[in-house]
Amino acid sequence: MNAPLGGIWPWLPLLLTWLTPEVSSSWWYMRATGGSSRVMCDNVPGLVSRQRQLCHRHPDVMRAIGLGVAEWTAECQHQFRQHRWNCNTLDRDHSLFGRVLLRSSRESAFVYAVSSAGVVFAITRACSQGELKSCSCDPKKKGTAKDSKGNFDWGGCSDNIDYGIKFARAFVDAKERKGKDARALMNLHNNRAGRKAVKRFLKQECKCHGVSGSCTLRTCWLAMADFRKTGDYLWRKYNGAIQVVMNQDGTGFTVANKRFKKPTKNDLVYFENSPDYCIRDRDAGSLGTAGRVCNLTSRGMDSCEVMCCGRGYDTSHVTRMTKCECKFHWCCAVRCQDCLEALDVHTCKAPKSVDWAAPT
């Protein structure tokens, strides 16, 4: 019994490194890094050489990406607001989400997709606002074109989403492309699904010109929809995410359950089932649901029964200031009174184990 273990022991650290996936998107930490571009590029942990090259070469793009982190994390938290895992971030952790994303779960699939989408959105918006040296409005949208309503002229500033997608692919995917393992392929797939989701909601907007708005002439441009549309779409993909396994040659996926269809480029994929997130678990990165607010009248994921994992809940009586007796005044204002409202707040009980609140 001891001989095989003795032979394996020197290689154990390497084996553990290979078996344990790494939370590779260290660029997520860019939201917390200030200072000059050189300071930022050299102090974000975990960036690969290609990412550092792009960081030094395009500091204005990096600033846009860093500002965008707050936007897509807020979107993630909005989508998961009624779930046991609520996309909570850890300020002192360079992976931003802690160990929870080490598992190749549905939640990891969503976070990689929405973060990749957030980079596309942030860069494309910065291009249109004239904040970047390397891009501007879409140069291809010039001259005359035709749609179902007739001819129109390209004008205004069409969002240059192709540039946003190209840069996001080069920067976000750089670290995954260095890996050959299953998790890297999963991340690449979900990153691409996120980028495609933003382009899906690119819409044509037009302005009419002519006597009394007769629309004898139209000027049109392409504009991204609000990021909430992308978030809602990816949330639907999260709920329909497809569990996969690596194929035999290690180059792609097959569905884990043969009854399900093969995933498309728009679908999210994952390998491992999620933990229940009921209790604090250091290894799983779960903070648990003790102290979370629950909805006593709901039958959904935010219900006290589901959110509290059957542990029960505490009720506290609180008062809050709200707007009331609002009236419309001509013209054009709405005036309200400040009123105190009494309500009950229900929060999940802690597990009976004495160590549930130990810091992670």
UniProtKB/Swiss-Prot annotation:
The keyword DNA-binding does not apply. Keywords: Developmental protein, Disulfide bond, Extracellular matrix, Glycoprotein, Lipoprotein, Secreted, Signal, Wnt signaling pathway. GO terms for molecular function: cytokine activity; frizzled binding. GO terms for biological process: atrial cardiac muscle tissue morphogenesis; canonical Wnt signaling pathway; cardiac epithelial to mesenchymal transition; cardiac muscle cell proliferation; cell fate commitment; cell proliferation in midbrain; cell-cell signaling; cellular response to transforming growth factor beta stimulus. Palmitoleoylation is required for efficient binding to frizzled receptors. Depalmitoleoylation leads to Wnt signaling pathway inhibition. Glycans are attached at N295. InterPro entries: Wnt (IPR005817), Wnt2 (IPR009140), Wnt_C (IPR043158), Wnt_CS (IPR018161). Residues 1-25 form the signal peptide. The keyword Magnesium does not apply. A lipid is attached at S212 (O-palmitoleoyl serine). One of its GO terms (cellular component) is extracellular space. It is found in: Secreted, Extracellular space, Extracellular matrix; Secreted. Disulfide bonds join C76-C87, C127-C135, C137-C157, C206-C220, C208-C215, C278-C309, C294-C304, C308-C348, C324-C339, C326-C336, C331-C332. Belongs to the Wnt family. PANTHER family: PROTEIN WNT-2, WNT RELATED. This is Protein Wnt-2. It comes from Felis catus (Cat).
